[in-house]
Amino acid sequence: MVFFPHRHLIGIKGLTEQDITYLLDKADEAVKISRRREKKTSTLRGLTQINLFFEASTRTQASFELAGKRLGADVMNMSVGNSSVKKGETLIDTAMTLNAMRPDVLVIRHSSAGAAALLAQKVSCSVVNAGDGQHEHPTQALLDALTIRRAKGKLSRIIVAICGDVLHSRVARSNILLLNAMGARVRVVAPATLLPAGIAEMGVEVFHSMKEGLKDADVVMMLRLQRERMSGAFVPSVREYYHFYGLDAETLKAAKDDALVMHPGPMNRGVEIASEVADGPQSVIAEQVEMGVAVRMAVMETLLVSQNQGPRTDGMMA
């Protein structure tokens, strides 16, 4: 029997191919649960999940909440806007307060890289990173991988082109780590101003042309232009950005005929992707949302139930 030896899910970094496969297989089981009429189980009955979102996120928070509830957990969404954090309380103070309530898992999203890892050091329960600054977003990478694997039957040796604002994207970082671990070929396509220094050292091919970067790609993953994280002139204008790096039907022709079109959401239609593509037959964007609930169910069950069936370490995946 394969055991999952980790207490927290802080990032994809530190996960083995076996760990990732285990979670994806678990998520496949969760998809079946989510598609049946009676969706609620008693797997996590009596356990408490607290969602602590310091950054606004409708879809991710709703996905985590639904995942916990479908497993039978008691789920509490902490509204940071009305909390002591707004009154000057530090993350550590918040962690100590929540830990005293004895939850079983804390789900955190924070604008600062490393926030989830810091929280994990201060609490006695499991911690799941729902996105920390520009660092990582592990469950997004897992749901993307599940979407690809279910459509293509594998992850190894497929060509994935990640296009757009790579510099500010924690989604890109987590996907690169996961896809490389699973044997995929990863490309990044972006203007030089939207690529982090040393990106090639992460084991990706770098392109500055959409036509060249998408050639023979099995998957085209578009990233949102994150204007709220920008403090400088990274692109001349939105119009020019779309002209060179937006995905429309004509640009998509460079990829394979059966290439998948993906986007982590929320989309900027007419900025990084055209509606004709986002809503077209090659789009699996809706499937990504569905797989998100399944992946988060798998993560919760694994951290809180499955890991107790075998040996584990208290070390973080960070």
Swiss-Prot record:
GO CC, any one term: cytosol
PROSITE patterns: CARBAMOYLTRANSFERASE
Residues annotated as binding L-aspartate: 87, 170, 224
EC class: transferase
Binding site for carbamoyl phosphate: 59-60, 109, 137, 140, 265-266
Pathway(s) served: Pyrimidine metabolism; UMP biosynthesis via de novo pathway; (S)-dihydroorotate from bicarbonate: step 2/3
HAMAP family: Asp_carb_tr
Function, in words: Catalyzes the condensation of carbamoyl phosphate and aspartate to form carbamoyl aspartate and inorganic phosphate, the committed step in the de novo pyrimidine nucleotide biosynthesis pathway.
Name of the molecule in the record: Aspartate carbamoyltransferase catalytic subunit
